[in-house]
């Protein structure tokens, strides 16, 4: 209803504006500017209010009206209350603490600063971290504002301290934190004889002088011993905080414990004395540059193979799953990978790894597969012994040996495993579930659990003869 009424008014104002005579434009201009219809024509076609007011500040400001500073009399009253002048008693108290020259400077400063300016323009802090004196910090005062002194950087020729230098540094540190009275020179036997015998050796002293000196010297030693025992009982050594500070903050180099202004610690030298040749280098010269990152160093120690032999192994990723773990932080997605590794000559290994990054998971699974390689029994280096059946969860795998030239009539995952192990004639059949991961696990267990003919012969107490070799005269694989 309101929108239709507003449209009618707008249409009527346009019709009235069209009927106004065009003559005397100078005289009709003021009338048109004050006409309600013209003002209605200039408004926008919406019911929202105009936002022509000044934008409100985001910060709360204390106005002069709220402080009572609306007139000169109130400003004067506020100034006398907040910035009162020194009374005679206060000046006498200041004169008791400051000399006459300082008092003249204080009076000159009071006369130079107008308290009214502080009332109108000043900003007084009320927080607990305010300065004990009033200052706007507009300029640096060399007397009050001291420049930060930068310490000299430590020498770039500094080296690690040896045993003797470290011992001396430890003694110096102990002397720095030693508490109690400073030590003094111990008196000698010569200090207890008359002055005329100072220059003479002890053998030329008279007997009575020597006996009296020995008596006084032993009494002095006993007194010093009792004093040292009493001081040791009252004295306190370094605290746990001092020892921790020495371990963490004390420099172990010959730089006099100087601290640089840089936030970066000084770099270690190329060759540390006393440690040179003892630290482990990630790059082994025997690798011929094949493992500059040190990726296969631990694997070399566990398997006994060289990096060149490790790189010649056949590896294949058989299973790659995307798994999601529900935690209190949400769903964490990661990659689960299964990799096989073999040398193509009767060795096969299986490795599983999981990581947030797929490349890291593949790398970890590959290293585990190489580490877990085990020998696979092969008949004539081409097939397995007899028939093997293995069950893993709901997956049942049946492997059968086949004659020469039969080939690998298996699935693609078992095909890769047989090629890595060096098996060329084999047939496989899945009786139940065909889960990829369980299939690989069951096949690997089946290859490891083959019946060994030598064990069967030993168990039966009979001699084992290979019929094929006898029939063909040994002209077989």
Swiss-Prot record:
One of its GO terms (cellular component) is mitochondrial small ribosomal subunit. GO terms for molecular function: RNA binding; structural constituent of ribosome. GO terms for biological process: translation. Keywords: Mitochondrion, Ribonucleoprotein, Ribosomal protein. InterPro entries: Ribosomal_Su5_D2-typ_SF (IPR020568), Ribosomal_uS5 (IPR000851), Ribosomal_uS5_C (IPR005324), Ribosomal_uS5_N (IPR013810), Ribsml_uS5_D2-typ_fold_subgr (IPR014721). Its main location: mitochondrion. Transmembrane segments: none annotated. It is found in: Mitochondrion. Component of the mitochondrial ribosome (mitoribosome), a dedicated translation machinery responsible for the synthesis of mitochondrial genome-encoded proteins, including at least some of the essential transmembrane subunits of the mitochondrial respiratory chain. The mitoribosomes are attached to the mitochondrial inner membrane and translation products are cotranslationally integrated into the membrane. Component of the mitochondrial small ribosomal subunit (mt-SSU). Mature N.crassa 74S mitochondrial ribosomes consist of a small (37S) and a large (54S) subunit. The 37S small subunit contains a 16S ribosomal RNA (16S mt-rRNA) and 32 different proteins. The 54S large subunit contains a 23S rRNA (23S mt-rRNA) and 42 different proteins. uS3m, uS4m and uS5m form the narrow entry site of the mRNA channel. Belongs to the universal ribosomal protein uS5 family. This is Small ribosomal subunit protein uS5m. It comes from Neurospora crassa (strain ATCC 24698 / 74-OR23-1A / CBS 708.71 / DSM 1257 / FGSC 987). The lineage of its organism: Eukaryota, Fungi, Dikarya, Ascomycota, Pezizomycotina. The gene is mrps5.
